[in-house]
């Protein structure tokens, strides 16, 4: 019996052929044991990376193998082999899952309290939020001393024993986490007898806007089955890093509440029913009309006194010196900028496209815990790199509201207490962008064809667990009828929105947008778009939006079809524009908008996801056409005992050699292990190599080390590249580039002294001439 294992992108794949073949294995990638009766697989990968296993007879159609449970890297999954089912020839692969919040799996969580009276303790502590200690177990992992409390507002008030639960994994054990998460939320799916709505909603929302992941969990508490919960990611630093790369900005929550209005009459504020006498931005307003009519937490400008905002918003995380000034300024710009300068001004303080997606999704999914309805129950993140605030979806348990099935798609456009809606949609260009995004959601996400498939998949995932749930407050008949009602709601809502006057106007079509083949850092990059008007309607305008990097506003350039703007020839429907040169390794994001020559200027985007998922290219750089004074001379990709760094650790190292008789200042040069990103790590100021001397750089991701040069990458012993590039001022020319294969431990790879263009394995000689 033989098997073959190889690495292929995001999954490992091996072939099982029931013939006496020799077995091959990509070492340290996936360990396997196959015999006549069983198969054992141990996938390798990044920390907290989870794998699931699939089978195919033809490498086209793959099915999950229920006998092989999903496992995390370095864990083992095993199953008995049924030859009649898998033979005579079969292909197996290990695919990366979405992780702990993958909705295709029910996570079995065990909680243990020392006191059997734990439920009463949690209820007593609900008002204060005080946690009680417990033990958490997931799979083979056990964490002692986690902090547990009840959570939620309306969900806590529900009848029955099952309450929503929050867990601080690192309550007593510093830096403790469960699969990379230090806070867990298990929600009781209040008012949702399908248990699906929050999970469906969040897994669509997160594709377009910062939003928690969501899946399912089955809780066992003190040995008793407490049934199925929504497993929902915390809106914390890990979520921020997931979407923004960094977690360096302030974060606020706009909690549920009532308050001021925004109109003509001064007054101290509003309130709950029957409403208050006034408030809002000067000169005041008619007061909160009761319930959720106020705008005090909806980014309404309420003056310059920070105390007003501190009483309304919760500052969840402070990273800057003046968070309240930042928030007040954003509300001031949003509410008070003059019309002629509004769009330009608001783009500087708000990520407008992200806010429009946020509004669209809350409306389409009829979310009652929403900005359009309550003006609260959302979060805000300030990204200091761009100076703009972004929305973060907060609560999804009231999505798919049946009473709002015919909610107007432009709900709130005339409501001064919802300025994010009323101010943005008052700009014709942004109004059409909002409508275009809503069309995209209806076409790609919120429609019976798509959501019914997901619903059926989710039902298949949880139905058996729901059957065994002793704490559910509904029957299985209600569960199944709820599924039918949910599907009917989706159909009705989709039909209503699709036939709405604003949405039924057909936009132009963009059939293609060019993808640059080799965009260089020394010349402009030309972009073409093939555009056609709808019916007899012509094209009003076509625009190219672009930016370098992952933050900041997009620049806008008009695309023309006049034969003079890199558009091939006039009048052929191909519009052209160019993007200026950027630095080597920069990721340039871009998308195209076309507007109809009709009264509404109906818009369409390519890709349809616009700024939530734009097209991307990475800028290339040229090789130097002269001999480099500094070369890559030797390196070691697996250093166990050969050479310690100044901190005493045995890490990968790269040796550079100054081949000239003069010292060379390489401050601002770059070192990288990725040809697509040659500017990965920059040499700090003062990096000088003496004449005919050597310099060691530690490839160990230890940039905070006080001594030595430590790059922000490691070398792969399986083989990759090392690049040395010049500074930004000299166009990041590739000065030297080595591509290498698999490396042996404690054996270096370097240039032969007698043949300097030849690299071979050798006895290490760091800091000295090579053999």
Model-predicted regions and their roles:
Residues 37-41, 523-527, 650-652:
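Structural beta-strand segments of beta-rich domains
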Residues 73-80, 565-578, 693-695, 703-706:
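Aromatic sugar-binding surface patches on proteins
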């Amino acid at each position: 019996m033989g098997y073959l294992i190889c690495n292929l992108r995001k999954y490992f794949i091996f072939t099982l052929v029931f013939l006496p073949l020799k077995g091959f294995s990509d070492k340290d990638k996936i360990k396997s044991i196959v015999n006549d009766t069983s198969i054992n697989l141990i996938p390798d990968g990044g920390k907290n990376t989870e794998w699931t296993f699939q089978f195919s007879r033809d490498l086209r159609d793959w099915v999950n193998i229920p006998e092989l449970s999903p496992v995390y890297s370095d864990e083992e999954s095993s199953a008995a082999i049924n030859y009649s089912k898998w033979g005579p020839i079969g292909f197996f692969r290990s695919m990366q899952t979405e992780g702990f919040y993958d909705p295709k799996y029910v996570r079995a969580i065990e909680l243990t309290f020392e006191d059997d009276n734990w439920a009463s303790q949690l209820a007593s502590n609900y008002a204060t939020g005080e946690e009680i200690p417990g033990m958490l177990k997931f799979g083979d992992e056990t964490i002692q001393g986690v902090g547990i409390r009840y959570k939620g507002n309306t969900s806590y008030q529900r009848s029955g024993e099952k309450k929503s639960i929050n867990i601080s994994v690192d309550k007593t054990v510093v830096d403790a986490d469960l699969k990379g998460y230090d806070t867990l939320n298990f929600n009781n799916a209040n008012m949702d007898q399908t248990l699906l709505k929050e999970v469906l909603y969040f897994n669509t929302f997160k594709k377009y806007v910062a939003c928690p992941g969501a899946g399912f969990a089955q809780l066992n508490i003190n040995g008793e089955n407490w049934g199925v919960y929504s497993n929902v990611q915390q809106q914390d630093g890990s979520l921020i890093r997931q979407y923004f790369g960094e977690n360096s900005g302030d974060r606020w929550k706009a909690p549920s509440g009532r308050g001021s209005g925004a109109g003509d009459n001064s007054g101290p504020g509003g309130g709950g029913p029957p409403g208050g006498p006034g408030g809002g931005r000067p000169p005041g307003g008619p007061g909160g009309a009761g319930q959720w009519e106020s705008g005090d937490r909806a980014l309404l400008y309420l003056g310059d006194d920070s105390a007003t905002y501190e009483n309304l918003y919760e500052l969840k995380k402070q990273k800057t010196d003046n968070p309240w000034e930042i928030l007040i300024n954003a509300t001031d710009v949003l509410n008070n900028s003059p019309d002629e300068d509004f769009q330009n001004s608001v783009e500087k303080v708000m990520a407008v496209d992200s806010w429009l997606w946020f509004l669209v999704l809350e409306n389409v999914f009829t979310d009652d815990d929403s900005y359009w309805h309550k003006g609260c129950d959302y979060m805000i993140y300030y990204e200091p790199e761009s100076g703009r605030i972004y929305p973060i979806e907060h609560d999804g348990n009231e999505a798919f509201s049946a009473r709002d099935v015919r909610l107007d798609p432009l709900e709130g456009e005339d409501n001064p207490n919802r300025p994010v809606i009323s101010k943005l949609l008052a700009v014709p260009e942004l109004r059409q962008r909002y409508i275009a995004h809503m069309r995209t959601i209806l076409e790609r996400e919120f429609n019976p064809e798509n959501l019914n498939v997901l619903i059926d998949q989710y039902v298949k995932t949880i139905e058996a667990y729901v059957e065994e749930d002793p704490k559910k407050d509904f029957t299985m008949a209600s569960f199944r009828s709820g599924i039918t009602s949910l599907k009917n709601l989706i159909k009705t809502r989709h039909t209503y929105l699709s036939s709405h006057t604003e949405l039924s106007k057909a936009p132009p079509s963009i059939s293609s947008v060019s993808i640059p083949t080799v965009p260089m850092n020394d010349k402009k990059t030309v972009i073409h778009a093939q555009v056609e008007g709808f019916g007899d309607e012509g094209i009003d305008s076509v625009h190219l939006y672009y930016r370098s990097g992952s933050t900041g506003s997009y620049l806008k350039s008009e695309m023309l079809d006049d034969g003079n703007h890199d558009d091939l020839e006039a009048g052929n429907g191909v519009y052209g524009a160019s993007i200026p040169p950027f630095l080597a390794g920069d990721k340039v994001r871009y998308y195209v908008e076309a507007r109809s020559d009709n009264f509404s200027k109906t818009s369409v985007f390519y890709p349809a996801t616009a700024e939530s998922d734009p097209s991307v290219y990475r800028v290339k750089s040229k090789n130097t056409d002269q001999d480099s004074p500094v070369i890559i001379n030797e390196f070691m990709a697996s250093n166990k005992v050969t050479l310690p760094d100044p901190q005493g650790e045995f890490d990968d190292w790269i040796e550079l050699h100054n081949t000239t008789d003069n010292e060379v200042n390489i401050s601002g040069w770059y070192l990288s292990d990725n040809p697509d990103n040659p500017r990965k790590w920059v040499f700090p100021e003062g990096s000088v190599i003496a004449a005919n001397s050597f310099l060691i750089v530690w490839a160990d991701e230890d940039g905070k080390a006080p001594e030595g040069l430590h790059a922000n990458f490691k070398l792969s012993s399986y083989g990759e590249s090392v690049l040395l590039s010049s500074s930004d001022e000299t166009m990041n020319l590739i000065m030297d580039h080595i591509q290498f294969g698999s490396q042996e431990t404690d054996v270096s790879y370097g240039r032969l002294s007698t043949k300097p263009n030849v690299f071979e394995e050798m006895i290490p000689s760091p800091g000295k001439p090579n053999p």
